[in-house]
């Protein structure tokens, strides 16, 4: 086990410098190289990423540049998440005291599950901050918090339109921040695949996004065609 952990750390240090990739992407790649492909590295990578982003990744992100697009500043996402986390924690503590009078085991199970939910929301927010969507080498790197990640060649984009319409369908990737609606709709020439938590995969041919600068984002995509 110690040998495996040492190999993961070594692989991580080897991939991280100048890669431009986020923590969760590099971590899962290191786990796949060390443990092998399958559910185990996907589950481990997701759980470690949730704990890292939910509890430790609070330093202000340094990402900047004309090809990098955040999706949390203008929507008030941080304030919403902070308020939601505070209210949820207050409710969790209140329910914990109540259930302790009924069943200690049930009280602790409910407490842990609810606390995990709060950590997940915080992790998704921090992942949105530290792993923004960006364009590089004529490819669109879509990062939706801790939930979805996908890479789409710009040449495969059929259209990109300003829209706040929340479309429905099986092949629609909702790459917005939690609690936010879209302001951009991207239609693709063909189906692509997104990677989600715990090894979940999703095929999509439309993407809903909510970058802080939708018009600049759209224009940069058009200029890259």
Model-predicted regions and their roles:
Residues 9-102:
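N-terminal membrane-targeting/pre-transmembrane regions
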Residues 2-21, 123-134:
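Juxtamembrane/interface segments at transmembrane-helix termini
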Residues 72-77, 184-225:
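Beta-strand-rich cores of mature extracytoplasmic or soluble domains
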Residues 80-87, 107-113, 205:
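Alpha-helical transmembrane segments of integral membrane proteins
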Residues 118-161:
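Conserved beta-hairpin
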Residues 95, 109-125:
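Single-pass alpha-helical transmembrane signal-anchor segments
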Residues 1, 101-115:
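Hydrophobic alpha-helical transmembrane segments
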